[in-house]
């Protein structure tokens, strides 16, 4: 039915020289192993190398960590290099180990902070790879103390804020001694504000613990931040009647305003940074 086209009916002779496969040597950085690129984001020699490369990718977002803290987190990941944690999605193990290690040092991230600095973790909708599920799996595999990441203990979340506004001359890893008074004050305000909401039956019980904590912390942070901007603009002072045992260190906040602003702006970029006008108006009643 079909006739061959003469112009395309070509023949060619190809001569190959003698090649001894055993005598060939791979180029530098050439990997002799096969890695399916559909399953590995970073094609590397081992899963351990892949985790470290992933950690470097994620940690660059935590701009407020110094080189000693970053080195410490790499050592923590290196300590579990022979442990198989997940069959797939190996790169996601590194940021979870970092989060749990930072939490062991007294600093945790709210949902908004997680979205700001680890959006891949926050936006994971798979039931198997959801945040709480992954935390539980890694705690079990690595022998960490088992427990929920988000609990009604506000100090660790404000400790992360303190990390972000630290003085450049801080000594020691995850050292926030100079900012400890701020952590105590913000925590006290949040505890009392939470109790006020409980008594008024304003807490949304259908929401998760992480969501409730996120709402409380965001409301306190943005309220204090906006009051601080007014104080700086008008060269005045402000107090909060909920901070009974630990007054707000206004001078510290003024001195670190640039760092505080940078941190708040990172949170504002997220979709989870939503402030209830009712909650904010209620909290503002206690500021003078």
UniProtKB/Swiss-Prot annotation:
Record's keyword terms, sorted: Activator, Early protein, Transcription, Transcription regulation
Keyword Transcription regulation in record: yes
Transmembrane portions of the chain: none
Pfam families xrefs: Pox_A8
Top-level division of the source organism's lineage: Viruses
Disulfide bonds: none
Keyword Transcription regulation among record annotations: yes
Stimuli inducing this protein: Expressed in the early phase of the viral replicative cycle.
Family that this chain belongs to: Belongs to the orthopoxvirus OPG134 family.
Function (record text): Acts with RNA polymerase to initiate transcription from intermediate gene promoters.
Quaternary context: Heterodimer of a 45 kDa (A23R) and a 32 kDa (A8R) subunit to form the virus intermediate transcription factor (VITF)-3.
Record protein name field: Intermediate transcription factor 3 small subunit
Natural source organism: Vaccinia virus (strain Copenhagen) (VACV)
Gene field: OPG134
